[in-house]
Regions:
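N-terminal strand-loop element at the rim of the active site
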Residues: 5, 12-19, 26-27, 31-79, ...
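Glycosyltransferase donor-sugar binding loop
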Residues: 46-48, 197, 225-238, 253
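Membrane-proximal helix-turn-helix segments that form the acceptor-binding/catalytic region
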Residues: 126, 132-149, 162-163
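Carbohydrate-associated surface elements
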Residues: 155, 174
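Conserved donor-binding/catalytic core segment of Leloir-type glycosyltransferases
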Residues: 186-205, 211-215, 227
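Nucleotide-activated donor-binding/catalytic signature segment of Leloir-type glycosyltransferases, i.e.
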Residues: 237-259
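Short hydrophobic beta-strand element within catalytic cores of glycosyltransferases
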Residues: 269, 293-296
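Conserved acidic donor-binding segment of nucleotide-sugar-dependent glycosyltransferases
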Residues: 308-309, 313-320, 329-335
């Protein structure tokens, strides 16, 4: 049993000030390790230092690149490499934990720069990631430096084995379940309310599938409401909503962690209509912890997390009619 305090460095590849499952996982892991008595420093890109936790070191301003069906905000290049080396030297870490070290990011730079014990956690799930194939020859020596490799799901593990001919132990992302189970229900989000959280402007998040399903759902439940949280400009989305149904939508923008817990404790159904590119689905675990019924597309990661339908309802990915049917069945059951 480990009893001494460790100096642990964690590298986050994605911009800290952009909401995302990887960032949330790293935040929770860092705070858990700190609470256990360890000294933790997280290196992450960020637009500025405002609102960064005390344990996060800003590696520099990220740039946006298309990646895995979305837009990733990462940092790479010689200036970033210099900052990574300086952070490693100053930290004198017992252990480094690198997230997504197989993409051009500060995690890969840290893997190149560091020696000693290193763990790599792989989050991405995709049938074919061109960027990994393209830089495979320079990735493999770096990945071989890792003392241990973790995949957050079987889908992420298969992506790793397919692209880099190496394997990993599957350890799912953890959450502070009590944070969500102790959320305070909010009257404005109760009733026949469907919730959605995410970067809804990204097509793979699947909000358009929910929009297409809503007219069918509304015919069964005339009082149904949809509450959408997350960064983005709702004006374009609102144009695609049936004018007779626009009043049913509320766009909250980016919300705090406490508001997210209250949100999950209030809504009737959380819908995750993502069309692909997800390796775990931490938001589903948060919704379940908050007591919401979960309806998710049947992409592999969501299917695994929901126990093939045991812990939540699944619908055929990108099929708005099937989504409507599943939601209506749930609302009908809640009325009994």
């Amino acid at each position: 049993m480990l009893t001494r305090c460790l100096k642990i460095g964690i590298v986050c590849p994605y911009s800290w000030d952009t909401p995302g499952g990887v960032q949330n996982h790293i935040r929770d892991l860092a705070e858990f390790l700190i609470s256990a008595g360890h000294e933790v420093s997280v290196l992450a890109p960020a637009a500025d230092d405002e609102n960064l936790p005390s344990y996060v070191v800003n590696a520099g301003k990220p740039i946006a690149i298309p990646y895995n069906g979305a837009v990733a905000r990462v940092l790479f290049g010689p200036v970033a490499f210099s900052r990574v080396r300086q952070w490693i030297a100053n930290g004198d870490f017992d252990l480094l934990h690198l997230h997504e070290p197989a993409i051009p990011s500060i995690s890969l730079l840290a893997c190149w720069a560091a020696d000693g014990p290193m763990i790599g956690t792989f989050h991405a799930a995709s049938k074919r990631q061109k960027i990994i194939f393209a830089i495979g020859p320079i990735l493999e020596p770096a990945i071989e430096k890792l003392s241990a490799r973790i995949a957050v799901s079987e889908a992420a593990r298969l992506t790793l084995t397919d692209h880099l001919d190496t394997d990993a132990v599957v350890i799912p992302n953890g959450i502070f379940a009590s944070h969500y189970s102790q959320g305070t229900p909010q009257p404005q989000w109760q009733g026949n309310t469907i919730g959605f959280i995410g970067r809804y402007e990204e097509p793979r998040k699947g909000l358009s599938v929910l929009l297409e399903a809503l007219p069918m759902i509304a015919r069964f439940a005339p009082d149904v409401k949809v509450v959408v949280a997350g960064p983005g400009d709702p004006s374009e989305v609102q144009k695609s909503i049936d004018p007779q149904l626009r009043h049913r939508f509320t766009f909250l923008g980016k919300i705090s962690e406490q508001d997210k817990a209250n949100f999950m404790s209030s809504i009737a159904i959380y819908v995750a209509p993502n069309t692909g590119g997800e390796s775990f689905g931490i938001i589903l675990a948060e919704a379940l912890a908050g007591g919401a019924c979960v309806v998710a597309s049947d992409i592999p990661a969501f299917d695994d997390l929901l126990g093939h339908g045991e812990f939540g309802a699944l619908f055929v990915s990108e099929d708005s009619t099937d989504l409507a049917k599943v939601v209506i069945d749930l609302l009908r059951d809640q009325d009994k």
